[in-house]
Amino acid sequence: MKTKGIVTGIVSNLVTVKVDGPVAENEICYIDLQGVKMMAEVIKVNGETASVQVFESTRGLKNGDSVEFEGRMLEVQLGPGLLSSVYDGLQNNLATMTEVFLQRGEYTDPLDHQKKWAFTPIAQPGDKVVAADWLGEVKEGWLPHKIMVPFSFQGEFTVKSIIGAGEYTVDQEVAVLTNEEGEDVKVTMVQKWPVKVAVKGYKEKPRPNRIMETGVRVIDTMNPIAEGGTGFIPGPFGCGKTVLQHAIAKQGDADVIVMAACGERANEVVEIFTEFPELIDPHTGRHLMERTTIICNTSNMPVAAREASVYTAMTICEYYRAMGLKCLLLADSTSRWAQALREMSNRMEELPGADAFPVDLSAIISNFYARAGMVVLNNGQTGAVTFIGTVSPAGGNLKEPVTESTKKAARCFYALEQNRADQKRYPAVGQLDSYSKYLDYPEIKEYLDETVEKGWVDKVLQAKNLIRRGKEASEQINILGDDGVPMSYHVNFWKSELVDFVILQQDAFDTIDALCPLERQRFMLDLVLEICEKDYDFEDFEKCREFFKNLINELRQMNYSAYESEQFWAYNESVKKMIA
């Protein structure tokens, strides 16, 4: 029998409920508001009183309204049809909700239960299976979508029967499994899983051992992110966080992209809706939307559902990872999620931490980032979830609690700088603050030595040192004037400008420059370092400036030319003559 309760207090979307039976933290309940059932989640239990956060507007709610507890946590439906879909934070399918405004208490089914999928069995009767083992597969777009033993199954099962190849709906029975007690359990293509619990179905979780290509030079060359790695992009408003994330989403070497628009402005999400269905994936030649799921919880949607949206997105990624696929999760912006946590913590009158954020903010963010990673599945294949979040610190202050907490959890840090954005040096990632801890991993060094070239990490560090020396020279020139410093200061400054303009800066709206393969990045960095290793002797700083400006112009034109085209080699020849 379900536990029931009545509303005893309301503070915005925090509601206190007196219950008549046992309830658990994170349990889902429905509050009855004049016939409209509003979903809520238990966040604290104290004796007979439960504090619940409501995922809808509580306008019109009053003391005495009835509440019914479901006895389950917030769950997502997992099955064929997740890709190309647009959901809100509670996994309501927004494509089937046609009104301009979403009505309170209106919840839709995330999957199409009428559509038939072409099923091909993988397992055989008599096979021994455990949770997350593959039973069969259906084609979802061009991806092989594995139908698995539900993650909630515990212990070993024997496949009693499995249906033959054919077209079936997601609700039809595809297999019957027998558990260790001899009981038969039916399996369909759909399973449910609570979003706040990490999906376990794998053998081990090793350290990442290869990088994920994004086509963005400032990431792949200077601060690479590993496949199954974590990174975050903090920066003030208008610095290009969203454009950089969109570039990674379009070009990232991943099978599945999940974008969680968590508390961002609606127009940025609309941009994805309009662009992605038309854009072609450079890796497969198919439409980008075919491999993308969007979890859309914009700034004008309920604040409480922001937390649900990031967990829903991560659970969908973990589901596809269990199929042996490479997944990329982009959350924009995790600051909004942290603000939702702060709002709820303050309403519950908990002890505040720094800037009134919850005291356990660091632990919450770390636990979430820990769900990403590369895994070895039970059958020996590998899957990965790579997570990149953006952080919007108030006033661009990178010392605020959300940035500091995320820094502890993420392995890559891409700090966007206001002054670089003001100078239109995009992407505005500042090299002196940004880092990738993966460059210290022996596995990653070995991978880069094999796939790019021997001693690649040393070359990257050499380029970073050029930028550092150029920054120091620039400060001295600004203080003492052009004539007040030795010529070597001018040369160091212009060498750093060369690295900046040719390697760090990239045009996200140019068809050629937007996507830069690793092979091309290797060629360009080698060329730039070859130029910078030479000794130059100029009569005065104006000659130095003119020489490097002409050189930068030729190299920029190379970036806009198709790799290894006649035009590309012509510019290359011109550069060689200039430095001869």
Where are these predicted regions, by residue range?
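N-terminal accessory targeting/assembly segments
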Residues: M1-Q103
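Short, surface-exposed secondary-structure boundary micro-motifs
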Residues: D20, Q34, R72-M73, Q91, ...
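Short beta-alpha junctions and helix-cap segments that line functional grooves
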Residues: M39-E41, V54, F69-M73, K146-I147, ...
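Short, compositionally biased
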Residues: I43-T49, P80-Q91, W142-G166, D184-V199
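Short histidine-centered loop motifs in beta-beta connectors
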Residues: V54, R59, F119-K128, T158-E167
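P-loop NTPase nucleotide-binding/switch module
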Residues: M97-E140, H145-S152, T169-G229, L244-A247, ...
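P-loop NTPase catalytic core
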Residues: T221-M222, G228-K549, E564
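C-terminal amphipathic alpha-helical interaction region
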Residues: E539-A580
